[in-house]
Design a protein with these regions (language model features):
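Non-catalytic cap/lid and distal C-terminal segments of serine-dependent acyl enzymes
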Residues: 1-293
Length: 293
């Protein structure tokens, strides 16, 4: 099934396209969740333009779920697009885990959760099946733990993501439930999950670093500025942003207008067909918004 190649149903009037939220179930090579959920929000654009839109993958925090991110960003995105911002498709994967609840959006050292592999090898193929985007038309965004996840995944895969947005993210190890394992393998896994290990490739990606002036979370406070200094040392392109809202999706919502203005996309080109991936679309009912991270 090609979701983006034709996944928006034209309404009665071709002049009045409507936004659409669809849930996919995408297979994952892991024990915790062999099938994981992904929500895909397509903005109100003509059906023939959907397959040409850029795609932004949006990662939630912990504890949390896609619901919180959807509740925080869809309304400000729709408003920004209505006022002329370049539209894109927003994708909300579920990065939760069972064995190691604080997943850090990683492949756990024991392989029980394979979230990074799932996101980069399975979700992209499922969501973009009608037109696999280039890195210039694909970005990754995250809040809190999702901000860490967005940053480290972009550093691991600069060939996949041309832009990364971290909102209240952090750039240090915060492995609360031992997703990165125990001795003797922990040291190597921890190094792989440490952003500074990959600082030399950080200049291959554009960075948006957002942090609330009212966020007093010890792990978060000052992380954007500290990472910005490291990015400057390797001549990476980055923007720092400070907004109100504390450590919450209110802050995320406040950042969205800046994010949409900051993003840069490649000129639109005709879609290149690609093999469809294994994804099962379900009813396009909006999930109940969650106020948690």
């Amino acid at each position: 099934v090609s979701l983006l190649g034709g996944g928006i149903v034209p309404c009665a009037s071709a002049l009045s396209p409507k936004a659409k939220l669809v849930e996919l179930k995408v297979k994952s090579p892991e024990k915790d969740f062999p099938i994981r959920n992904v929500w895909v929000w397509t903005p109100a654009v003509p059906a023939d333009q959907v397959k040409l839109l850029p795609v932004v993958y949006m990662l939630h925090g912990w504890p949390g779920s896609p619901n919180g991110m959807i509740a925080g960003v869809v309304a400000p995105l729709a408003k920004a697009f209505a006022h002329g911002a370049a539209p894109f498709i927003a994708v909300f994967p579920d990065g939760n885990a069972l064995t190691h609840a604080d997943s850090e959006w990683a492949d756990s050292d024991d392989g029980r959760a394979m979230i990074e592999t799932w996101l980069t090898k399975y979700v992209i193929k499922a969501v973009e099946a009608g037109n696999i985007r280039s890195r210039h038309d694909r970005a990754i965004l995250g809040f809190s733990m999702g901000g860490y996840g967005a940053g480290i995944i972009a550093l691991h895969h600069p060939n996949l993501y041309g832009q990364v947005i971290t909102l209240a993210g952090y750039f240090v190890i915060d492995d609360l439930t031992n997703a990165f394992g125990y001795a003797p393998t922990h040291a190597a896994k921890a190094a792989y999950q440490t952003p500074t290990t990959f600082l030399k490739v950080a200049n291959q990606v554009r960075w948006f670093l957002g942090e609330s002036s009212q966020d007093y979370t010890e792990l978060i406070r000052g992380q954007a500025a500290a990472w910005g200094k490291k990015l400057k040392s390797v001549k990476a392109s980055y923007t720092e942003s400070v907004e109100s809202g504390g450590h919450s999706y209110i802050f995320v919502s406040n950042e969205i207008p800046k994010v949409t203005a900051w993003l840069k996309w490649a000129p639109m080109k005709p879609a290149t067909p690609a093999p469809s991936a294994s994804a099962i679309p379900t009813n396009s009912l909006r999930p109940t918004p969650s106020p948690t991270a």
